[in-house]
Design a protein with these regions (language model features):
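Mobile cap/lid helix-loop segments that gate and shape the active-site cleft of serine hydrolases
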Residues: 113, 160-198
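Glycine-rich nucleophile elbow surrounding the catalytic serine of serine-hydrolase chemistry
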Residues: 140-152
């Protein structure tokens, strides 16, 4: 048990994806009022860049991660949804970008791993006795929103996707060298995903 309130209980979960080397992990939050035999919808709640699954279930308003995410996975659980907050490997400043750079020449990306992780997560969620396998949604914030625009389009089992805070002026941000808000002037050199906005 990771955390428990009057309305829900959460668990830290680890799932094998490709043996023990590549795995998926996150926080499953389950409302306490689920009746025997009842199946509830699930919302997969994705953190952003440098985030962790714990960030989206944080309910202490004095914590910085609450200021960013407002505990949206916990709030959804309070409203009766099952939530799963997975970890995505876009952490460690430049470390995940090195993996991305190494993957590109062999025709892969960081999302090649993330997609495999999410396929396993969805399969697992669909197999739980208290989840509605036809109602698994995806909600991502910031880099999680980037994930929301890519993963549910490929992974079978998501019924809808919400992208929050990762969609405005995208082509201009990626392609510009004339404006200071362009990614070319940041440490996020992995952003120019050419032809994505075409």
């Amino acid at each position: 048990v990771y955390q428990e309130t009057e309305k829900w209980i959460s668990y830290e979960i680890t799932l094998d994806v490709f043996g023990p080397e590549v795995f998926a992990w996150g926080i499953l939050t389950v409302p306490k009022d689920i009746r025997q035999g009842e199946k509830r919808p699930v919302v997969v709640c994705q953190h952003g860049l440098e985030g962790l699954p714990f960030d989206v279930v944080e309910t202490d308003s004095t914590q910085r991660n609450y200021q960013v995410y407002k505990g949206f996975a916990a709030r959804l659980a309070e409203r009766g949804y099952i939530t799963f907050a997975p970890h995505n490997p876009y952490r460690g400043q430049d470390k995940f970008r090195v993996i991305q750079r190494k993957a590109n020449p062999i025709g892969l990306t960081l999302f090649s791993v993330i997609i495999s992780q999410h396929q396993r997560i969805v399969e697992w969620l669909q197999g739980l006795s208290f989840t509605d396998a036809e109602k698994i949604a995806f909600y991502g914030i910031s880099y999680g929103g980037k994930t929301a625009m890519r993963v549910p389009a490929v992974v079978k089992g998501y019924c809808l996707s919400v992208c929050s805070a990762d969609f405005n002026e995208w082509v201009r941000k990626v392609a510009t060298t004339e404006h200071a808000f362009g990614y070319v002037y940041t440490g996020e050199y992995d952003m120019p995903e050419w032809d994505l906005g075409h």
